[in-house]
């Protein structure tokens, strides 16, 4: 009997190892959206099944329950992203090319007002519900503009040590933001509007996307050198690092599944399993599409959304242009829906 149990145990271990080697995720849908231009951040509102997609000079609003485009917010030049203030029925859109924030009514999708920011190229944007303030992170001026979300007025500017990337909030008075060119994370006090700490993410380099686990007090910072850095946000200590795909610009955390997803522009999505606060393992690298570098997760359906498009062949290398970039094929903008098989 012991021999049979031993053989059975070995068989189960083999099956488990075989299963873990298989891809558990796949592309379920591809949503084509008309229009041309680049893209950046994407935001999911689970309560309405609406996906807010930055796209060129407009913001697309897509219903993932009906698979239909439900609205477009125009005149958002160089749009980077949107942050939702559900308690105020407002959305705040960062417009990089005209240094402004467009404030919209979330029910009607109509513009309420456009506010000029105090920096250059507002990129990532965050509504912080604890303070009811909005923070734009201005990439070319290394600062953050602070807006009172109730009055729609600029109330302050925060100087940062370098180029800010994506921010997250602990919902208790602290904002964490990647500082790309300093290889660090800065901690902002939302009451004093001061930087309290700056923590290195070494060996991570050029951090971009950032996600948060508020239960275990962890930050997930994804970096250009194909690395995810896990940081204790109570102490700033680097807990561990994991290998991810290349060209990353976004990361999402699903607290129910305890999984972290990095969207890699090379055309993969790295899936990381959290075993406990300090232990993580890479489950797989799911094929997506070249250029799918930002991501949002629906924490109810556990599906992931990644914008992408097809590319033309890159032009030949010349002395004047030693690093030519491939252009996007017109009319190919798509949002990938990725889910469990």
Cite the ranges covered by each PLM segment.
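Bacterial N-terminal signal peptides that target proteins for export
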Residues: 1-8
